[in-house]
UniProtKB/Swiss-Prot annotation:
It comes from the Bacteria. Pfam families: DCD. One of its GO terms (biological process) is nucleobase-containing small molecule interconversion. This is dCTP deaminase. The lineage of its organism: Bacteria, Pseudomonadati, Pseudomonadota, Gammaproteobacteria, Enterobacterales. SUPFAM superfamilies: dUTPase-like. InterPro entries: dCTP_deaminase, dUTPase-like_sf, dUTPase_trimeric.
């Protein structure tokens, strides 16, 4: 059962569900909360590798996959007044402005905006589930499948999240996992481990 707008407001008021900054009531719609785009983007650079080998990246000593991030990607931060252009065929990572903390008995579902999708913007490539016990900003996996560059601006409404009540509290929520690699994330770093 998904939470309706009234229930979302109650959960926020009781701090059972935490969204920072707290959304105004006009951003809580029916069964979703609108999410805004932050100002951090991770772009994929041109590189000389013939392919990406997840086994190799996963096996780096001490999971030093950060070298992969810095050799093949670059995180940029723009001001609130700047624009970011996503060109056709490009994949870029970005973040929601909001940090979200989900309790152990809820699961979140991220959706892109239909009006943006009609111009070719995919907001999340595959990962739209936000696990029970999650805390942090949500990474967005933008892809422009259209024919023209798409202009993105910090603070624009980029998608929405809904919340579904579980039958009980999870016994293995995300925040209690030993390998919760993205817990409390505030950046777009790619951490490759436990893939193979």
């Amino acid at each position: 059962m998904r939470l309706c707008d009234r229930d979302i407001e109650i959960w926020l008021k009781k701090n059972k569900l935490i969204i920072t900054p707290r959304p105004s009531k006009d951003r809580i719609n029916g069964a979703t909360v609108d999410l805004k785009l932050w100002n951090k983007f991770r772009i994929f650079e041109s590189y000389n590798a013939a392919y990406i080998d997840f086994d190799l990246i996963s096996s780096l000593k001490n999971n030093n996959s950060n070298s992969w991030n810095y050799n093949m990607t670059n995180e940029i931060k723009i001001s609130e007044k700047e624009k970011f252009f996503l060109h056709p065929g490009e994949l870029v990572l970005a973040l929601t402005l909001e940090s979200i903390t989900i309790p152990d008995n809820l699961i979140g579902w991220l959706d892109g905006r239909s009006s943006l999708a009609r111009f070719g913007l995919m907001v999340h490539a595959t990962s739209h589930r936000i696990d029970p016990g999650w805390s942090g900003n949500i990474v967005l996996e933008f892809y422009n499948s259209g024919k023209l560059p798409i202009l993105l601006r910090p603070n624009m409404i980029i998608g929405s999240i809904s919340f579904e009540l579980l039958t009980n509290s999870a016994i293995r929520p995300y925040n209690k996992k030993k390998n919760a690699k993205y817990l409390n994330q505030i950046d777009t770093v790619i951490k490759i481990n436990n893939l193979t």
